[in-house]
Amino acid sequence: MELFQAKDHYILQQGERALWCSRRDGGLQLRPATDLLLAWNPICLGLVEGVIGKIQLHSDLPWWLILIRQKALVGKLPGDHEVCKVTKIAVLSLSEMEPQELELELCKKHHFGINKPEKIIPSPDDSKFLLKTFTNIKSNVSAPNKKKVKESKEKEKLERRLLEELLKMFMDSESFYYSLTYDLTNSVQRQSTGERDGRPLWQKVDDRFFWNKYMIQALTEIGTPDVDFWIIPIIQGFVQIEELVVNYNESSDDDKSSPETPPQDSTCVDDIHPRFLVALISRRSRHRAGMRYKRRGVDKNGNVANYVETEQLIHVHHHTLSFIQTRGSVPVFWSQVGYRYNPRPRLDKSEKETVDCFCAHFEEQLKIYKKQVIVNLVDQAGREKIIGDAYLKQVLLFNNPKLTYVSFDFHEHCRGMKFENVQTLTDAIHDIIIDMKWCWVDQAGVICKQEGIFRVNCMDCLDRTNVVQAAIARVVMEQQLKKLGVMPPEQPLPVKCNRTYQIMWANNGDSISRQYAGTAALKGDFTRTGERKLAGVMKDGVNSANRYYLSRFKDAYRQAVIDLMQGVPVTEDLYSIFTKEKEHEALHKESQRSHQELISQLLQSYMQLLLPGDEKFHGGWALVDCDPSLTDAAHRDVEVLLLLSNAAYYVAYYDDEVDKVNQYQRLGLEDLERIEIGPEPTLFGKPKFSCMRLHYRCKEAGGYFHTLRAVPRSPEEDGKDTLQCIAEMLQITKQAMGLDVPIIEKKLERKSSKPHEDIIGIRSQNQGSLAQGKSFLMSKFSSLNQKVKQTKSNVNIGNLRKLGNFTKPEMKVNFLKPNLKVNLWKSDSSLETMENPGVMGNKVQGESDGDISSDNDSYHSDEFLTNSKSEEDKQLANSLESVGPIDYILPSCGIIVSAPRLGSRSQSASSIDVSTHAPSEAAAGPGSELGKGLESPLKKSPSADSIHTRTGFTKPMDVYCQRFVQDAQNKMNDLSEIRSVAQKSEEGSHKTNRVSNEETQSEPMGQTPPRPSQLNVSCSVAGPPFLSVEPVHSVLSQKTPSSGSSLLELEAGLCVTPSSESSSSRAVSPFAKIRSSMVQVANITQAGLTHGINLAVAKVQKSPAEPEAVNEIQQNELKNMFTQCQTRIIQI
């Protein structure tokens, strides 16, 4: 269409239609094309593709008209519908201000033989002269207030800055798409329900994804049919369309194409190889739209940040198959202050304030998609845990049977760049994927519909989310192609097709990431190639730094533009950004100085801590250990401190989760064999960094080394100079000992070191000592680490009989033993312990974000521990100190499990297999009696170990509620419970309610593969019995009068009994207090894959001193307040 400039209007004309845009008030008018003759001196400026809308960047400034200046054809969807991408826009001020250089395509009708369009604006020199004259006249007539002049200049500066950001948003990201004949906002399934709807396209669109709805509002309000021609619905997101050929004889075109662009298929003349069309369409919601650190979580209307619906289309002949997934921020009120690199998330509102908005979000989702399968990928420990816990709690409170909650700790399962382990997730939920189906449409109509949707999220809903969504969509696509006969049943996707498919999803992730975070997606190399390379790790580090910079100031302008586009009031003081921008350079320099000071402090403190008194400190450096075998998937690299003394060098591993060093290694200089310096080992691309490899011998054996690189001060540096200085220092120091070490410059080989030995763990600050452990690699990089953290509940009950002397109502008691710590939880009527963090790499007590404990106040007393222990207790305590954790492997499923810790009162249920449905009763046998040496005073009571109260809960939600009501309403129970334990010998009444409920969908036990019924773990005599799983009939036949009253109702027929092998020692009841309100029991198939089944095991342990009537009243209140928990919970 042609664009004309007149004195009072800009006129868009195509055929017999014309749209007049006022340059005085910004009004839009539909007029016939013949009215162009009435315009004052119209001049054709060029051709445009369409109208996006208009925007006002400030209330005191004029409107701007946004036009599509240039488009690019993306491809054609089934039905020959063209999809175009907006590549360039033109912005016109609807004021008397003359337009700038628009660079429009010239109209051949009005500009034949002319290279540039004619202008009615004067020359630049004349413009400046007239502007200066006008300014002088204005200043002479009315001397304006200097303050007003300053404000006017600030407004103009702000407008220019926002206008610049608007142009970048449309022209740099290439994330806006439209089609004149196809509804990109609606999926195939939603379109199929309204095929007979005769309304125009813009009236049938999904309001959530109609990105320019507010900007085009002046046209939609006109209401006449003539306006339909001018309204073009635009989506923000991603669209890519590719045609693939199923040919197993072709090889990959890796050498002929770059990872960013898929290989071009040559024309297939052989009809034997079937073709199919693949289209990927991602639509970003316009509600709560914005940038990463500006928009998080949910708003008051239930809209979440970064909400994207992604549809994968497969078209074969006349069959169109569609599968959709969504992503969106965790729907609770949370935020991250983006002025710190990798800031910690925080909850902004309480649980009660969040419930209504959480319900509003999922009620809308269920209304649209019927069912929701939530796949939560946030870390289940560390700084992300607070968000994951809040999410799970809201899901349980929402309590809807149409929801399924799947928890998959992505970083835990994919440590060490093993992103192919995502298959563990897809295999575990394979049945859910198949049951969800997909939409299938042909010429006759709808064949089947997709029943439900996957809602995948991580913290940002970018990197991890894209990898998982691509994996799920791949499973669906293979099922679809096999269903249509395009792929053989037992064959995978051809290499060439697979590569193109991976590239499409990687491009999708990059596009969404640019829109939300400002940079390309991390982990994109895995999505693109299926492999995680060291170059991708380093690239991720650069992108993380870029995201941090962008979030500081540039995002503020981008967020303001997005809000203005959507008609949302701009809440941030944009004028203050000017000052912040000026301060940015100084702040950046200051932060660099602060960083150097922090490193100096760290080096000084750990030099004093690690170096013996007889060694002299020669130097220290902060480096990065880039050995691929040590690379942590959660943080992409491992920061280390390299300390050098006159006799040894120390490699101290820094944990940024707790801002401290938790493990280190001391290596004598005499064992240093050689030093290699060269480009980083990469498989593709040009190396960006130089690395230093320190080879050393351990116990006269070689093959050990550390691969380190320096942190460059600028992007242009590779850190080689720093590494050479370090190498020379090492060489000079060793020469002072009368030895020498060669320094070799060469390209480093891509290989991994042998597992480092003699790793020393630094214990908690409270203990102030060092413990040596040899499980550093396992604790820091294996998936066992978090499982061990979550199943730690070791308690020496023998030490608790004198705890009744305490009078403080809320406190936490820490017994400062070398490897045992007892916590009295304020909000949890339980006593638990946490293992010594020295070996397993746990966080320091008192961590700022409360990853391990949410309690703030603690009471430490070594004297109390000494005075309260008997000689027998001390002997048992000494035996506990001498035994460390042992880990085992279940051979039937290949899952690493942690052996029960000595003195534990409970064991994780995650290693117990449950596969029967018949309800049964589990009883504690004779092995549950208290061991010799601990029977006084507990065993003096004849029924102390056998009298239990059977609670008839059959609903998981009742159990869940029981726990939280006790926590909320009975904070004093902790004290009363402890006192009652101390007075057991006089009162003689010890009653414990244990309730657990299980919902399982596994197969009968006879159909599951055999696996060991008991973990036969060798241990010392003082060790407790281990949990065992036995058939139902065996337990019923073993019940005795003394144990028959100790019951545990399990819907799935789980029967857990203590082993009798260690009956001579103190036996720990398997039904002891489980602090977690949600424990997952998984059914393991022959392939070793986890099919999650939810088991809600909540503690319902009332104080013996508490009146039973009070407890019954609370239980009745819970049953009236909550119904059965119908949400399926799966933890993988």
Swiss-Prot record:
Null allele phenotype: Animals develop normal corticospinal tract and raphespinal tract. Mutants show greater axonal growth and functional recovery after central nervous system trauma. Knockout mice have normal cardiac form and function but show augmented hypertrophy and reactivation of the fetal gene program in response to stress compared to wild-type littermates.
Tree of life domain: Eukaryota
Cellular component GO terms held in the UniProt record: axon; clathrin-coated endocytic vesicle; clathrin-coated pit; cytoplasm; dendrite; early endosome; neuronal cell body; recycling endosome
Protein EC: 3.1.3.25
Keywords: Coated pit, Endosome, Hydrolase, Membrane, Phosphoprotein
Entry annotated with the keyword ATP-binding: no
Name this polypeptide is given: Phosphatidylinositide phosphatase SAC2
Lineage of the species this protein comes from: Eukaryota, Metazoa, Chordata, Craniata, Vertebrata
